[in-house]
UniProtKB/Swiss-Prot annotation:
The protein's name: Probable lysosomal cobalamin transporter
Domain of life of the organism encoding this protein: Eukaryota
GO cellular component: vacuolar membrane
Source species taxonomy: Eukaryota, Fungi, Dikarya, Ascomycota, Pezizomycotina
A Pfam family that the UniProt record links to this protein: LMBR1
Functional summary from the UniProt entry: Probable lysosomal cobalamin transporter. Required to export cobalamin from lysosomes allowing its conversion to cofactors.
Any coiled-coil regions, as ranges: none
Residues carrying a glycan: N233
Biased composition regions of type Acidic residues, renumbered to the chain: 537-549
Length: 575
């Protein structure tokens, strides 16, 4: 029975990983630029995102497996749940976690940078003429990746030798002292994981919070578009008439011979010609938005958009309420940690017992009794936070200080930007792993629905009723709790980071308040600001579409000419 139960749980996880691979594939395909697709970049981004999402979505499997050893209704371990069986379950989970975390670190610090430089080293002309071989390209990418290999080695060496916290028992650290006894390999991985989560907290506090505020409001209000297409069309018509009138004046001044124009007038004429092309493109877009264009597909798209607009607003409203519920839950747990943490900054604000009701946490604890309902809810939560981060990155952009380096847009993201965005998403997902497990749903992520039977000393009631069923918690140090309760491996790994290196735990904790503040500021800004149409970007997109159409037309013409030449040659041979 136990083998069948655990096998089904792992089968559900395998199905979820396949779904994640499909989601990552569609996500990368939708965002990458069709003109600059690279198979190596696409595959790397898909594998990296799938690996990170698979790591965080292992948590419900972790909770389900450790919770399956306990009968929550009576607070006792099941007959088959011997210490050896429980140790075997936790060992297998620990092994999977360490493999996934190691893979995540290697992908983020080694594979993604190498593929980035591999793409940058490609010279199309040199490759076509045979002047650049794959070996030369590999060596060029490897030289630049050596710095990341050095960072990775230094990171693990520092993790091996850096001293861990040795807080005394007076700090209330007794329930967590077992976490300090890991070997040096675990210590190195713990330090590397803590450092990457720390970097990811910046992305989480800035981009994820901004995206979660912008995404629902954008669905409710609608994105920037040609909302009043009729007036836009009239405006563009007037501007186009004015442009052409000025061109006629200049052409009349020179009598059709442009050599007679001054350099100033020639520059003005060139500017008017460029402006005319821009206005014609804008006028065509406005006509399509107004349903007056000749193209069938754009007209159908705008009509479908108008039909689904009420449903989109309903989805936006539901997402807004859900994100606000998550935000309130984070405030409650963060306040609980700040007030009731057993050892405050000495152990990274670890919370031994939940003292303030958390609605999201309670939803997960109750749904965990009916696996995989909690898994479905957890997956939707993770995907919401993931796509919120994507929207935040697209809104803020990839910047260094105030300088914009890359822009993330649907169908217009370059391979370099795609790789950088993937690395940023990997860091943010690591930070999300901590926030969901320790802030959003701490009881669920640590013990799930596990309970234990707390014996009542000196009770006069029947022996089978001489106990009170309580939820498991680290704060309970009784023998009954220790014999029954098994913390999840995910919570053990994260608590090991915060207890062994309290400065990481302090950064993680205070980053939650930064997230809360940035979200509130971004939400107020999104509510007050109306979406604006980026005319410059609209012109660039239209120009790019025209170039693509011209290139496609040129390719078709060349193919037709080639087929015609081949046909004439074959007919000549027959003759």
């Amino acid at each position: 029975m136990i083998l069948l139960q655990t096998s089904l749980i792992w089968v559900v996880y395998a199905v979820v990983v396949v779904v994640l691979f499909a989601v990552a594939s569609v996500f990368i395909y939708v965002y990458q630029s069709p003109r600059d697709r690279s198979p190596s970049v696409t595959l790397t981004c898909i594998v990296a995102i799938t690996s990170l999402l698979a790591t965080i979505l292992l948590l419900p499997v972790d909770v389900a497996l450790v919770s399956s050893t306990v009968s929550s209704s009576v607070g006792q371990r099941k007959d088959w749940a011997t210490p050896e069986v429980v140790d075997r379950i936790t060992f297998s989970l620990t092994l999977v976690y360490y493999i996934l975390y190691s893979l995540d670190i290697l992908l983020c610090l080694l594979v993604v940078p190498f593929v980035y430089f591999w793409y940058e080293e490609y010279d199309e002309v040199a490759a076509q003429t045979g002047e650049q071989s794959s070996g030369q390209r590999f060596w060029g990418a490897s030289k630049y990746t050596l710095s990341f290999i050095a960072i990775l080695i230094i990171l693990f060496l520092v993790g091996v030798f850096v001293p861990i916290s040795r807080a005394n028992g007076g700090n209330g650290l007794d329930p967590f002292k077992s976490l300090l006894g890991e070997n040096r390999g675990e210590r190195a991985l713990t330090f590397a994981l803590g450092l990457l989560i720390t970097i990811g907290m910046y992305v989480y506090a800035l981009h994820t919070s901004t995206g979660l505020a912008v995404l629902p409001i954008r669905l409710i209000k609608g994105g920037p578009r040609l909302s009043n297409a009729g007036s836009w069309n009239a405006t563009f018509t007037v501007q186009l008439d004015s442009n052409r009138e000025r061109r006629r004046q200049l052409e009349g001044r020179c009598g059709g011979n442009f050599d007679h124009l001054s350099s100033k007038d020639r520059r003005e004429l060139d500017a008017l010609i460029r402006e005319e092309r821009t206005l014609i493109r804008r006028q065509r877009l406005a006509q399509e938005a107004d349903g007056k264009g000749n193209a069938l597909l754009p007209r159908m798209w705008f009509r479908l958009e108008a039909f689904f607009r009420p449903f989109r607003r309903l989805v936006g409203l539901i997402l807004l309420l859900l994100v606000l519920l998550i935000w309130v839950s984070m405030i409650l747990t963060a306040s609980d940690k700040a007030k009731n943490s057993i050892c405050k900054r000495h152990c990274g604000y670890v919370l031994g017992h939940i003292n303030i009701f958390n609605p999201i946490n309670e939803i997960f604890v109750q749904s965990a009794k009916l696996f995989p309902i909690d898994y479905a809810i957890f997956t939707m939560l993770v995907l919401l936070l993931f796509f919120g981060t994507v929207v935040g990155i697209a809104t803020v952009g990839i910047r260094f200080l105030w300088i914009s380096i890359f822009r993330i847009r649907l169908g217009h993201t370059s391979p370099q930007a795609l790789l950088v965005m993937t690395a940023i998403l990997m860091l943010s997902i690591l930070a999300l792993n901590y926030s969901i497990s320790m802030i959003v749903a701490p009881q669920y992520a640590t013990f799930g629905p596990q309970t234990f039977c707390d014996r009542l000393s000196g009770s006069s009631v029947l022996p089978e009723l001489q106990c009170v069923v309580k939820r498991c918690s680290e704060a309970f140090g009784s023998d009954a709790a220790k014999k029954v309760c098994t913390p999840s491996v995910a919570s053990t790994v994260l608590n090991r980071v915060t207890v062994s290196f309290p400065f990481f735990g302090a950064i993680f904790f205070w980053s939650q308040f930064a997230f809360i503040g940035v979200y509130l500021l971004a939400l107020i800004t999104s509510l007050l600001r109306s979406p604006k149409l980026d005319e410059q970007q609209l012109d660039e997109d239209a120009e790019e579409a025209e170039e693509e159409a011209l290139l496609s037309g040129s390719r078709r013409n060349m193919d037709d000419r080639w087929q015609s030449i081949v046909g004439r040659a074959s007919r000549s041979e027959d003759t």
